[in-house]
Amino acid sequence: MEECPICLADDQEGEQFGCLNVCGHKFHLNCIREWHKYSINLKCPICRVESTHLEVGEGQHALSINLKMGFMIKNAIDYVGAETTNERNEDDTGEQDQEIEFLSERLRGTLVMDTIKIIQCSICGDTDVSRLSLYCQDCEAIYHETCLRGLACEVGDRNTWQECTDCRSNALLELRMGAISSQLASYDSRNSMIFAGELRDKHSVKTQQMYEQIRNAKHKIQMHVRRALDRYPLPLLRFKDAYKHVNKQVSRKLYRLSDNKYLPDQYDYDSLARTGVHTELLIYCHDE
């Protein structure tokens, strides 16, 4: 029994199979033509090798279809429909079973060996890093854009091609792996991760994220302090120095109060800023 790797249905469904002339992979005629139409190229969904012809049928009923010129799929099915291919010897069956098993392995998605992750397309398994273009920010699955488009076409919802097939997230970003694009690449997920489209050390990523979170929190807190300062008409000659001094002192107290986090649900920053600014201005003016 032969199974189409795209729709996973077998030849008992009445669908005619076609064989790509370069790589030899077989698919239902409708499935492979729909795949090619939506993926914007003529590459095999399994091995990514481009084929220009699709071979249908055997012997005197054989038909070679030029994929670049297009064809009427119904006419091709009618042409080879009279041929019966029920007789297969044991050797052929064994080879087909092995091929199906191989295809199943290739279509499982990203290979994970303990903590070592292979950088490859999560749909077709291709490991040529130079051709991988998108990755999921949530689960780090990697894809060819053409594979995502093709799969969306096959499931009947073309608007979902920008959705990760592993975790269903819409957080797909551009992948930039040029430095290792000439070789099979892998990484240890305990120490490394894909971040902002690049392979990065996990420690450096966490440090960067922590720094950005603190910086954003401080900026938001400072906005409350500045609004409170703007309520006071300070003398022009002393305005700049007083503004900077009070802003720094009050902001630091609010940073420490919320442990360098911005927690507007727990703290009334406007009220705290007004109180802090008033207190610091009294101290500043007294010292002056």
Curated annotation (Swiss-Prot):
PROSITE patterns: ZF_RING_2. This is Alcohol-sensitive RING finger protein 1. It is found in: Cytoplasm; Nucleus. Pfam families: zf-RING_2. The lineage of its organism: Eukaryota, Fungi, Dikarya, Ascomycota, Saccharomycotina. Its main location: cytoplasm. It comes from Saccharomyces cerevisiae (strain ATCC 204508 / S288c) (Baker's yeast). One of its GO terms (cellular component) is nucleus. Keywords: Cytoplasm, Metal-binding, Nucleus, Repeat, Zinc, Zinc-finger.
